[in-house]
Design a protein with these regions (language model features):
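Conserved small-residue-rich beta-alpha loop and adjacent elements
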Residues: 124-194
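Short beta->alpha connector loops at strand-helix junctions that form conserved
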Residues: 168, 173-175, 202, 223, ...
């Protein structure tokens, strides 16, 4: 059983308490995960805040280079990360319709590379004899990321890479059900980034609540349930924290009269049961035109 640690200011940090992470296929204990305290969250946020002034003025080209390097480093550990993802989350390597751990790993690398190529150009909203008005998008500061268990690595990358690319520093808290792949990924990423730019703390929902209330976190990014998103919104309002909430969807499919039902049915089935149906984008409603309803 591997040892896992928090990563704060580029260093591995042990905790007094741990919690068990289970293999959902066998319900056996897969690992003991560090349980961060409120004080350790404060340390992680303080490290991110110390790193922010330097990281925020790092050349745009250098941040882009580092994101490409991160993708390469994660790719070099792709087999290890994919196996760990299967063990803690339960999805097989290939998965239903080919959308298993291997797909998530591939998406992780692609997202790193794609984000590296994004830019934040100056937007000119007025340029005439009266005035020239430009919009410059500047880094916010410390971003808190709270991620779910259904796509633990991919969604972590969705949160973290745009934040880093735009000059912010990050404290991430993965789901307590699937923290191991994210812990290992952050460890790998920290071999490339300056200390404090990316920190990770692990624990239960109380740690996420503390992040939402933390006065030195400038923005919260959360993917998860609508009830939890409502709580985060309420907490963040207390200190005018910016938020991005990706909550549960209610996706629909529409089958029109001229549809080739035999061809469409397997795709509809796959869309409903991708990742065992445990995804915000899974098909939940199906509308079929009355002319082909019986078919």
């Amino acid at each position: 059983m591997s040892d896992y640690h928090l990563i704060i200011d580029g260093q591995k940090v042990a905790t007094e308490e741990t919690f068990a992470v289970l293999n959902p296929a066998t319900e056996e204990v897969l690992a003991q995960c560090p349980k961060a305290t409120a004080e350790q969250l404060d340390q992680a946020v303080a490290a991110a805040r110390r790193a922010f002034p330097s990281w925020s003025v790092t050349a745009d080209s250098e941040r882009a280079r580092l994101l490409h390097a991160i993708a390469d480093a994660l790719g070099a550990h792709g087999e290890e990360l994919s196996k760990l993802l299967t063990l803690e989350q339960g999805k097989p390597m290939g998965g239903f319709a080919g959308l298993g751990a291997g797909f998530e790993m591939g998406g992780t690398l692609a997202w790193c590379h794609a984000t590296a190529e994004l830019g934040l150009p100056v937007e000119v909203v007025q340029d005439n004899d009266e005035a020239r008005i430009e919009v410059h998008r500047k880094p916010l500061g410390v971003v808190g990321s709270i991620t779910p268990w259904n796509y633990p690595l991919l969604i972590a990358i969705w949160h973290v890479m745009p934040a880093l690319r735009s000059g912010n520093t990050v404290v991430i808290k993965p789901s307590e059900y699937t923290p191991l792949t994210t812990l290992r990924a952050v460890e790998i990423i920290n071999e490339l980034l300056p200390p404090g730019v990316l920190n990770i703390v692990t624990g239960d929902g109380s740690l996420g609540a503390a992040m939402s209330n933390h006065p030195d976190i400038n923005k919260i990014v959360f993917t998860g349930s609508t009830p939890t998103g409502k709580k985060i919104r309420q907490s963040a309002a207390g200190n005018l924290k910016r938020i991005t909430l990706e909550l549960g969807g209610n996706d629909a499919a529409i089958v029109l009269p001229d549809t080739d039902v035999a061809a469409a049915a397997p795709k509809i089935f796959a869309t409903a049961l991708i990742n065992n149906g445990q995804t915000c984008a899974a098909l939940k409603r199906l509308y079929v035109h009355e002319d082909i309803y019986e078919e």
